[in-house]
Amino acid sequence: MEKIFQNVEIKPLLIDFSNPFIKNAAKKLFQLEEQLPLVPVNVVMDFKGINRAAVHGLSRVLQDEIPNYMLDIKPGGYKIEDSTDLFMTEQFIRNRINFIPIYAENESLVFALRSLNNSCEVKTIYTRDLIQVAGPKLKYPIFNPTFEIGFLQPGKSLIIEDIYIKKGIGRKHAAFNLAVKTHFSHLDIEQYPTDKKEYMALSGYKQSSMTSDPRHHRLGLCFPAVPMPRINKAVRTYLKNACRVIIGRIQSIQKIYENFEEPQPELVLFSMDEEKTKAIITIKDETHTIGNLLKTCIYEMIPDISFVGYQCVPHKQEMVLTIIHKASQEDLITLLEKSIQNIIQMFQTLEKNIDELIA
């Protein structure tokens, strides 16, 4: 397969210390003399030779369908008897701690917050007030010291133990989102000029991307917290992990029909008439992301297919794929296998391209 990953631009968002106003503000508020240890990183990527569903799938997985980490408070960690500021409720503080942008590689670290306001003014609590109480010594910070956690009135205290690192995915809790601001566009569809779009309220493309089958795409996103010395390595790891997540989810579908001659509740095959076969495949805990990718790639593999579609069933946490084709049961399974192998090969090639392009 030809090179899919054509180009990448990686741009960290740095503090402009050349601006005296920004420099003085950083020094006054946070005692900063240099860049923060973690920075947001904008990434713009160009892909060629793949369908719209593949780029959409990569975008969705990078944002909220890939395992990531957040900070959370263990049950009983918020010490109610020692926390005397009634405005700083457990839920308020938990939400703030959940959404601290972090760069973590495991779940072994534990932190605590023990803050007392002895002044006559309101005290702002920042992430720099967190102290590590368990886990290996850090080679670099996993969060910036400047994120606001809460506030303390004069004479009040806030005590929290057992702030730990939790693993999950963004579609179940937004704090686990890996990338933010994901967006993609198609470079091989002619667009209206910007002024014309605003004046005539046009969508942008002169032809619908649903019917034009674009093959040249640009995907943009932002990783909120990446260590300064490891920007390229972190971006490369994130992108490769996203490819592996998609490959793993596609491979799990293979296992459903590998022994299709044996009765399986996840796979129903039957003949509609002398020519057509209908397959209904139920995939647990799957989403629109993989459904759309499968549907598009099966259509590409079998252009004369009678029907292919999917339905997500949220209350059952499953996705149901339906295929109807003029073929025997064995031939239909063979065609489905080829379609899935094409998807796996596509993302394996993309993973290889990522290694080649991001040093």
Curated annotation (Swiss-Prot):
Keywords: DNA-directed RNA polymerase, Early protein, Host cytoplasm, Transcription, Viral transcription, Virion. Its main location: host cell. Induction: Expressed in the early phase of the viral replicative cycle. Pfam families: RNA_pol_L_2. GO terms for biological process: DNA-templated transcription; viral transcription. GO terms for cellular component: DNA-directed RNA polymerase complex; host cell cytoplasm; virion component. It is found in: Host cytoplasm; Virion. GO terms for molecular function: protein dimerization activity. Gene3D superfamilies: RNA polymerase, RBP11-like subunit (3.30.1360.10). In the N-terminal section; belongs to the archaeal RpoD/eukaryotic RPB3 RNA polymerase subunit family. In the C-terminal section; belongs to the archaeal RpoL/eukaryotic RPB11/RPC19 RNA polymerase subunit family. Part of the viral DNA-directed RNA polymerase that consists of 8 polII-like subunits (RPB1, RPB2, RPB3, RPB5, RPB6, RPB7, RPB9, RPB10), a capping enzyme and a termination factor. Component of the DNA-directed RNA polymerase (RNAP) that catalyzes the transcription in the cytoplasm of viral DNA into RNA using the four ribonucleoside triphosphates as substrates. This is DNA-directed RNA polymerase RPB3-11 homolog.
